[in-house]
Amino acid sequence: VLQELNDIDNAIKILVEVHDPYSSELDIVKRLVSLYLEKENFKDATIFNDILLREYPDDQSGYINAAIISLNNDSPEEAITYLKPNIDKYIDNYSALYLLGTSYFQNEDLSNAEEYLSLALKVYPQSRSSKHTLAMIYDQTGQWIKSDSLYLDLIKTDSTDAQAYNNFAYSLVERKANLELALEMSLIANKIQPNSAPYLDTLGWIYFHLEQFEKSLEYVQQSYSIDSTNPVIV
């Protein structure tokens, strides 16, 4: 009840008090891990999730939690070691499939990333996160019919998705497919989310390819003034 009322600190306090370290109850341990993850307290989440993995190895949530913690620790390889050996048990579990696909993507294993994110999307067809990452994978692997289809779907289902507009624009300009459409998409992205360094950089790159060099320089300079560390701009 306290968790539902967003009184997470008191919920944790009560659960810790009733938790018996010598006889851990599954529901209490799972709830504690969930609360610590919600608080982004990954240290304590790990402590209780280790109990979950050790005492309840058949419970799926322990491996999923471990993968979440690993990804937040910038360790996709570790996340893969938790999920891959058990993935046959999670064939209908969106979270497990999505996390495994995301881990492979962060590890630059695009083939496996595509496989598991595609499975995740079959389980949960409305997953925008899966669509975004799959679109980037298709783009990087030259499967542009698939990437274009996903970008258009993302835009159609949410006209405020600046990332979809920008990534579609960048994809188009990189392959010089349709610069006018790329410009239209990029302008919309920048209208939705002004002062975004990567979005301004995309717009400048499009104007460069359209040989409108003054405009190109203007937007690249704006982008650089916001984020001078972007290696693409530098």
Task: Go through the PLM ranges and name each one.
Residues 25-27, 59-61, 94-95, 128-129, ...:
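Helix-start (N-cap) detector for alpha-helical repeat units in TPR-like alpha-solenoids
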Residues 1, 34, 68, 102, ...:
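Residue-level recognition of tetratricopeptide repeat
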Residues 21-22, 54-56, 88-90, 123-124, ...:
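Structural marker of alpha-solenoid helical repeat scaffolds
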